[in-house]
From Swiss-Prot:
HAMAP family: MoaC_B (MF_01224_B). GO terms for biological process: Mo-molybdopterin cofactor biosynthetic process. Gene3D superfamilies: Molybdopterin cofactor biosynthesis C (MoaC) domain (3.30.70.640). The keyword Membrane does not apply. SUPFAM superfamilies: Molybdenum cofactor biosynthesis protein C, MoaC. The keyword Lyase applies. It holds the Pfam family MoaC. This is Cyclic pyranopterin monophosphate synthase. Homohexamer; trimer of dimers. Belongs to the MoaC family.
Amino acid sequence: MPANSRSARLTHLDDAGLPTMVDVSDKAVTARSATAESRVRFPAAVAAQLRANGLRSAKGGIVETAVIAGTMAVKRTHELIPFCHPLPIDACRFGIDWAGEQVLDIRCTVRCVHRTGVEMEALTGASVAALTIYDMCKALSHSMSIGPTKLVSKRGGKRDIGAAQ
């Protein structure tokens, strides 16, 4: 067992082991940001078709729809994940582009000024954007895969993670 894991504890459990929302009322209000990434992998023929069609499907613009869905998800993260605080989101930006012949890379960066971070919002945005891309393309194939989805960076809390975005 790593030395630091003995003192670490799950923050969403109280002393009795019951689930609870973290009390952030004593935390300082600071600028917070987080970037998350997800990927959608397509079969070669589907990727070629999407490239030829400018990332449009019979349902419409794939990237545009994914950005809208991801943004909506960022703003509603607290409704989806029980112990997330509702946050005043100041910015939400997506980057969606090819990362190889068959993989679309989705990056979601979220910013706010508050007492708690926006990692879950960024992860939720990237995840829902990836799910939306799957939905937009499933008429072409169900052999797509999503992942990995991961936190790339976060700034403004107790500890920063990853490179500044």
